Amino acid sequence: MFYHGGTFISLLENPMRRLASLLTLSLFPLLGGCSSTPAAKPVVVPQPKSAFINQTPSRSPVYSQGVSKGDFANRTNVDRFVQKMVEKHGFDSAQLHQVLAQAERYDWIIRLMDAQAPTTAKPTGPTGAWNRYRAKFITPDNVQNGVNFWREYASELNRAEQIYGVPPEIIVGIIGVETRWGRVMGKTRILDALATLAFDYPRRAEFFTSELEAFLVMTRDEGMDPTEPKGSYAGAMGYGQFMPSSFQRYAVDFDGNGHTNLWDPVDAIGSVANYFKAHGWEKGQPVAVRGQGQLPGYEHGFQTRYPVASLRRAGLTPTSSLGNHSEASLLRLDVGTGYQYWYGLPNFYAITRYNHSTHYAMAVWQLGLAVKAAR
């Protein structure tokens, strides 16, 4: 659902967070991911509580006049994109050209994207990969920051659970892994990131062109200056690092102020919960269960599916209830001295819709549980 490209985000494995999708587009503000909302008008966004960051772009679009040069000015592929935006969304051609002419192309964004390309290399034995990954997120300081966030927004987290059926620890875990509860939301202008990848990164041009489209629509509809929003180098926005397309589909105005703002923690809480509900979260069901035994010859990963009975016959037994599930994916975690095997259940799979990675989903879940236990 989200594409991750910031300082903290780049720690995660498969680009989904990095590409699995991430934030929203609008007419002119290239920045976060919001779904289309009513007409643009000045928005008053509540200030964040306590020390939690609330990067709120200005709500009145301001477009420079007469911009005729820049990294993306007078480009054929840009002209085609503008024409599409005019015909499909009713944008003004001259004004949109002016906005895109203010976008800057960055080679470092392309280099970082190339560095996140999937690798086919497989380790020959246990190396402790899961231990290293987990240690990036589940630390005493990070857990305490999560406790503080939960306390600050307890009522909003509880309301999200009541409406969407997603428990607070999952929402807290996602926001913690994505941005450390708003502390690391990215410093790259979304317009620059998406324009660079849409117009000068052929390998993923189709995907990022659609994200740029969504971003511009989002900024127009939310009354934002498209040159102001900042996020990850891949265009992910706000506390939950939504891509613009995810904004369009899943972002909600959870504080009821008439605007959907992913840089506001309350809207982010509701949007993350809505995302999980839309991706099949099962209220009251377990996420994953540790298995007792070893299955070295079995294919593993969150996309596998096995009857629980067949896993039992092969020598793996669950250490706690699997809820009402008779099938599960087989997860394997490299802990250095060997491998842990887990039963992945539908709620675990739902977390991987946010980022297609077993490590990512396990870190989100275990961080949320650690914060819950420390409250």
PLM regions and their residue ranges:
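Bacterial N-terminal signal peptides that target proteins for export
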Residues: 11-23
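Aromatic (phenylalanine/tyrosine) cluster motif
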Residues: 2-3, 8, 28, 52
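An acidic, Gly/Ser/Thr/Pro-rich helix-cap/linker signature
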Residues: 37-152, 158-161
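Acidic/His-rich structured neighborhood in mature extracellular/periplasmic domains
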Residues: 125-271
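Sec-exported extracytoplasmic/periplasmic mature domains
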Residues: 82-91, 101-108, 162-165, 176-183, ...
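C-terminal functional modules
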Residues: 333-375
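C-terminal motif of bacterial Sec signal peptides marking the signal peptidase cleavage site
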Residues: 30-33
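Flexible, glycine-rich surface segments
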Residues: 222, 226-336
